[in-house]
């Protein structure tokens, strides 16, 4: 994607998961037009990669790979939105969520300043505590009994990651933000099994690098106002989070 237009990716990501009239877009029509621009832009890039030599970027890999080179328009657009939203929205909200969590738990911030090596374990704890996507829907492929309930083949099932990540039967003191938990990666934010997020290790690496650089450069990232949350039952994130940097 052209570097000069990279801000469009975050804009399209915000629009894809937003409801008109709450700060991102004013109407369903304006939302539709901006997403059409997104689809048109990537369709042109797809054709450009298709006609050129294989390259190392993700779009080129999809165009030339046996499993993805013959995607239908619907499949292409579905993968596109998944990559745009999953590739930046969740990470951005986890960064903001980490800042907020540390401010709400100053003792944990003190731990981090005393021992920046705790970043490795703090990253999955941020992802659990924030849970940037609240839920995901699946279709049952067979009848099953679960929790004294019958789920029929073809039923739509909503899995509330945000609930599982606060399950006291599995996670000790689940509502607390603790950066040195013994098993910090015991969470559901990335899904599970064949549907587990393909970019989970990349997301963890991005957050790790961000916090390594933050701790090198600044003593304190202070939240100085109330966060404004995204109006969504799907994305658990922030429109704004005012902070003050203290060197």
Where are these regions (language model features)?
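Cytochrome P450
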Residues: 1-247
